[in-house]
Design a protein with these regions (language model features):
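Terminal presequence/propeptide segments associated with secretion/organelle targeting
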Residues: 1-160, 165, 170
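Structural motif
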Residues: 94-96, 211-213, 443-446, 480-482
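Short, conserved charged micro-motifs
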Residues: 98-106, 348-350, 548-550
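HKD-type phospholipase D/PLD-like phosphodiesterase module
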Residues: 146-203, 213-434, 469-519, 525-540, ...
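Long, C-terminal catalytic modules of enzymes
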Residues: 309, 518-601
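Charged helix-capping and loop-helix junction motifs
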Residues: 455-462
C-alpha cells in the first residue's frame, strides 16, 4: 500500500498518494511549519582558495581515481598530525595507505596546477560507494564541505527542513517559570543513574515520559518494579527508532540492552491498563521532521527530569563512579550527558501539557499506509586498538557528584522551558545576540553547517563563528568525534570557525552552552538545522552563577582531559559488505559494531 506524503512545488502544497496528487487549500497549507527548505534564506559562501581546490579536484579526479586504493577525490583542507590546517588541498581517500609503490602509482604531493594533495583513509560511505553500494540510509549527514561540491541533484534536499504538521497544545504556554523550587544538577556517566533511580522510585501517582530511546535493562527493571508495587499510571511517547549493538559486540556499553518492543511488552504485562505507550510520527509531512529526540520525564505533576541523554546503558550506566574503587578508565566508553531534576509543579505542568499532547497526537493521527521496511545497514569493523587507546589514555579523570540548589519565596529561581518546534529559536537567538562579556563554552554532539541553512539556523551559526574569532573572548567548542569527523572539521573551517578553539570528544552527547559563568543552556537539542527547528527536543535556560558553574566545571574538565584537537584518521571503521564477511584473526583485531554506532543520534 503506498504511503501518503506532503510535497511542495511552485509554492503549492500537495498530498501525494501513490501516483495521485491532491492539492491542499491555502489556509490548510499555511499552518504547516516550518517553511519548506526549498526557500532558503542564506547560501554559505565558499572561500576562494577552497573553491580553487574543488575545481582542481574536478580536473584531476579521473587521473587520481586510476591509482591503487583510491576511492574518492574532492576538494578540502590538508591535515597535519591529525589537525586541520588552513591549506586548501585535493583530498584523496584510499582504502589503506600503501608503502613501496612505484613512482607512477603514487599519489603526487602536488598536482600539475600547483594544488597540494592530502591522502586520507576512506570513510565507510566512500568505501561502499566505491563498491557500488548506494543508499540514502548509508549517506553521510549533510555537511557543508560535501554540499558545496556535490552535483545539483545530489545536493538537493540535504538537511532540508521538511513541511511538518506539528501544532502546539491549545492554551499551553512556554513562559518563564519563577518561584520556589529545587534543582539537582548532575552528569553522566558519573551520577546519572544514582539520581534517576530515586526520581522514578518516588513516584506515587503518574509518570509522563517523552524519550528518544528506552532500552536500558536496569531502567526497565526499576520501572517494572514501580508499576508492579504501586498504582502509578505510566504514559510514554517514544521515538520510532532504536539503536542496539550486534549480538557479538560483547564490549558494547549497550550489550545487554533490550529492544523497545520487549520493554513495552514487559511493562504492559505488569501494569496493564495503567501503562500506555505510543510512537511519535516523524518524517516529511508528519508531526516532527526526523526525530522525536526529547528526553523528559514528569513525576506526579511536581518534578521534571530533563536530559541530553536517552534511557540506554550508554547514557545512563548502572555503575557508581563516585565509589573510590571505581575504574575511572571506563569513563570514556560512556556518553557525557548533562541532566537536571527540577522540583517545581509549575514547570512540571508546563512540560506535562506538551508531552500529553504529543501522546494524543500520535494516538489520534494514524499513519496513512504502511512504510516499507528499510534495508538493513551494514555492520562496521572498528580497530580494537583504537578503542583501547581511549581507555589507556583516561588519566587524571575527575568525577562530579550531584549538586542540589534550593530556592524559596524570598530568593526564587527563574527557569525558561524550551521546546522545538516551539520556541528554541526565539530564546536561543535572543541569548546569543547579546555578545558574551568574557567567555562562551559550547558542548554538543552536533555542529553541522550546511550550504543552504534556513535564515534562523544561519544566524545561529554566524553568531558562533563570530564569537569564535573574537580574540577578546574565551570561546571553546567541543563536539562529538563520531562519523565522518574529517569532513565535519573541514565544514566548520569552510564556514569560518576559528579551528584553534574547537576540540572533538568521543562519547560527547551533551547539548549545552555556558556563558560568562552565569548562564547555562542544557537539554537535548542537537545543533543541526532540523534539530533547532523541526524535531521534538527540550532544553532549559537558567541564569544562576552556581548552577552554571557546576556545568562549567564539567566542561573544563572535558576540555582538558577528554577532548582532543587532533583526530586519528587511521582508525576509520571498515564496512562489512554483504558476501565479503571476514572472520578469524580479524575478530580479534576488530570489533564489529552496528552502523548506528558511527552516526549521530
Amino acid at each position: 500500500m503506498p504511503t501518503a506524503r506532503l510535497i511542495e512545488e511552485g509554492g503549492i502544497v500537495y498530498v501525494q498518494f501513490g501516483d495521485q496528487r491532491l492539492r491542499l487549500a491555502d489556509e490548510d497549507a499555511a499552518c504547516l511549519r516550518p517553511p519548506p527548505a526549498a526557500r532558503p534564506g542564506v547560501e554559505t559562501a565558499v572561500p576562494a582558495e577552497l573553491a580553487a581546490a574543488i575545481e582542481s579536484a574536478r580536473t584531476f579526479r579521473d587521473m587520481l581515481m586510476q591509482l591503487p586504493q583510491v576511492v574518492s577525490v574532492r576538494g578540502g583542507y590538508r591535515f597535519q598530525d591529525g589537525r586541520i590546517t588552513q591549506t586548501p588541498a585535493v583530498v584523496v581517500a584510499v582504502e589503506r595507505k600503501l608503502e613501496g609503490l612505484a613512482p607512477a602509482q603514487q599519489i603526487p604531493d602536488v598536482l600539475p596546477d600547483g594544488t597540494p594533495t592530502d591522502v586520507t583513509v576512506a570513510d565507510p560511505v566512500e568505501r561502499l560507494e566505491a563498491q557500488g553500494v548506494t543508499s540514502a540510509r548509508v549517506s553521510r549527514p549533510p555537511l557543508l564541505i560535501d554540499q558545496i561540491q556535490a552535483a545539483a541533484p545530489e545536493a538537493e534536499g540535504l538537511e532540508a527542513v521538511p513541511v511538518i504538521t506539528y501544532e502546539p497544545p491549545s492554551g499551553a504556554s512556554l513562559a518563564p517559570v519563577t518561584g520556589p523550587m529545587a534543582i539537582t544538577c548532575h552528569v553522566s556517566p558519573d551520577a546519572g543513574w544514582s539520581v534517576l533511580r530515586p526520581f522514578l522510585e518516588e513516584a506515587h501517582q503518574e509518570v509522563t515520559l517523552g524519550m528518544y530511546d528506552f532500552t536500558a535493562p536496569h531502567i526497565y527493571q526499576a520501572v517494572r518494579s514501580l508499576l508492579r508495587d504501586s498504582d502509578v499510571l505510566w504514559r510514554q511517547t517514544l521515538g520510532p527508532n532504536e539503536s542496539l549493538p550486534g549480538s557479538d559486540d560483547i564490549d558494547s556499553t549497550k550489550a545487554n540492552d533490550k529492544p523497545e518492543a520487549d520493554i513495552i511488552l514487559g511493562l504492559s504485562r505488569v501494569a496493564k491498563e495503567r501503562f500506555e505507550s505510543t510512537f511519535a510520527h516523524v518524517g516529511a509531512g508528519k508531526t516532527f521532521a526526523s526525530a522525536y529526540h526529547i528526553k523528559v520525564a514528569i513525576r506526579d505533576a511536581a518534578a521534571t527530569w530533563l536530559s541530553s541523554g536517552n534511557w540506554q546503558s550508554s547514557n545512563q550506566p548502572a555503575i557508581d563512579l563516585l565509589d573510590p574503587a571505581a575504574d575511572r578508565k571506563l569513563i570514556p566508553l560512556y556518553n557525557r550527558e548533562w541532566h537536571a531534576v527540577i522540583e517545581s509543579p509549575e514547570l512540571a505542568d508546563t512540560f506535562r501539557r506538551y508531552l500529553r499532547h504529543d501522546f494524543e497526537t500520535a494516538e489520534q493521527t494514524p499513519e496513512v499506509g504502511l512504510e516499507v521496511a528499510p534495508a538493513a545497514l551494514p555492520d562496521l569493523l572498528v580497530p580494537v586498538d583504537e578503542l583501547l587507546e581511549e581507555e589507556r589514555g583516561a588519566v587524571g579523570l575527575e568525577v562530579f557528584p550531584p549538586a542540589r540548589f534550593a530556592f524559596g519565596a524570598r530568593d526564587p529561581l527563574t527557569v525558561q522551558p524550551i521546546l522545538t518546534p516551539d520556541n528554541y529559536l526565539d530564546v536561543v537567538l535572543d541569548l546569543l545576540r547579546k555578545r558574551p562579556n568574557e567567555r562562551l563554552y559550547f558542548q554538543n554532539q552536533s555542529l553541522n553547517p550546511v550550504k543552504e541553512p534556513t535564515p534562523a539556523w544561519a544566524e545561529l551559526l554566524r553568531l558562533l563563528v563570530e564569537y569564535s574569532n573574537d580574540e577578546a573572548l574565551d570561546v571553546r567548542i567541543i563536539f562529538r568525534n563520531i562519523g565522518p569527523i574529517r569532513n565535519k572539521l573541514e565544514s566548520l573551517q569552510a564556514a569560518g570557525f576559528n579551528m584553534d578553539r574547537i576540540r572533538v570528544q568521543k562519547g560527547c552527547h551533551t547539548k549545552g552552552i555556558v556563558i560568562d559563568s552565569a548562564t547555562v543552556l542544557l537539554g537535548s537539542h542537537n545543533w543541526t538545522n532540523q534539530g533547532v527547528e523541526a524535531n521534538r527536543d527540550a532544553s532549559l535556560l537558567i541564569d544562576h552563577p552556581e548552577i552554571a558553574g557546576y556545568y562549567e566545571r564539567v566542561f573544563l574538565h572535558d576540555w582538558d582531559h577528554l577532548a582532543r584537537a587532533a583526530i586519528r584518521e587511521e582508525a576509520m571503521p571498515i564496512p562489512v559488505i554483504p558476501g565479503q564477511e571476514t572472520a578469524g584473526a580479524e575478530a580479534v583485531a576488530f570489533r564489529r559494531v552496528p552502523w548506528s554506532a558511527w552516526m549521530e543520534e
